[in-house]
Curated annotation (Swiss-Prot):
PANTHER family: RIBONUCLEASE 3, RIBONUCLEASE III. It is an enzyme of class 3 (hydrolase). The keyword Hydrolase applies. Its EC number is 3.1.26.3. Keywords: Cytoplasm, Endonuclease, Hydrolase, Magnesium, Metal-binding, mRNA processing, Nuclease, RNA-binding, rRNA processing, rRNA-binding, tRNA processing. One of its GO terms (biological process) is regulation of gene expression. The keyword Translocase does not apply. Residues 164-232 form the DRBM domain. The gene is rnc. This is Ribonuclease 3. Residues 13-138 form the RNase III domain. Gene3D superfamilies: 3.30.160.20, Ribonuclease III domain (1.10.1520.10).
């Protein structure tokens, strides 16, 4: 369809209402929220700025939700749960459940290459939609949308193991545009039947080390320590 005809934007407004439960008042904002950079480069503004905002709004609302749902959890455990809930794969999972790719406006080239099902596109677009709902309707409107989709995931966290610390640290690093963490075995001690491995992990120039009875366990322990360190430094 012609992306920005009067009829098409009304149809788009209805589609977004059906998947989000929110009806946009600002149609220009909605257009921007569903415009992929590939078509924006040709004629229009894209969702990238809204994506930036939506990422922060999602983190805020999920943090608030976890603070309320788990009053006995420590700061460290709440941080782990937040990372598990806002990591890219979870955002993509929700975007897929909403069929969000079907309403995105993108170039023919992007469409032909599978853009509507591309995980990166879906993650970015959902964060942009969150940012747009926040701008158009305020915190209460976007809180309602986020809780509708993230609260069931949060309540299931108690019944499932939290994300492996190495994976969580890697996604944290990538989310901050850092190189992926590197691990180095710096010592092996102990008896032959009971070795102790010491592994150092490096992220953005910062290093910590930890030990374990297996190299794998030492890496996980080091990742956990690093994750606690960097989230305290960089998260509000």
């Amino acid at each position: 369809m012609e992306p920005y005809s009067e009829d098409s934007i009304l149809a788009l407004t209805e589609k977004v209402f059906k998947i989000s439960g929110y009806r946009f008042q600002d149609h220009e904002l909605l257009k921007t929220a569903v415009t992929h950079p590939s078509i924006a480069a040709e004629r229009y503004a894209s969702y990238e700025r809204l994506e930036f905002l939506g990422d922060a709004v999602l983190g805020l609302v999920v943090s608030e939700m976890l603070y309320t749902l788990f009053p006995d959890d420590s700061e460290g455990l709440l941080t782990k749960k937040r990372i598990a809930l806002v990591r890219g794969s979870k955002v993509v999972e929700i975007a897929q459940s909403l069929n969000l790719g079907n309403i995105l406006l993108m170039s023919k080239g992007e469409l032909t290459s599978g853009g509507i099902s591309n995980n990166s596109n879906l993650e970015n677009a959902l964060e942009a939609l969150i940012g747009a709902i926040y701008v158009d309707g305020g915190l209460e409107s976007v809180r309602h949308f986020i809780l509708q989709h993230w609260k069931p995931l949060a309540t299931n966290l108690a019944d499932t193991p939290l994300q492996d610390a190495k994976t969580a640290l890697q996604e944290w690093a990538q989310g901050h545009n850092f190189a992926i963490p590197s691990y180095r075995l710096i010592n092996k001690s102990g008896l032959e039947h009971a070795p102790v491995f010491t592994v150092e992990v490096t992220v953005n120039g910062q290093r910590v080390h930890a030990t374990g009875c297996k190299k794998k366990y030492a890496e996980i322990a080091a990742a956990k320590l690093m994750l606690e360190k960097v989230t305290k430094q960089n998260d509000p």
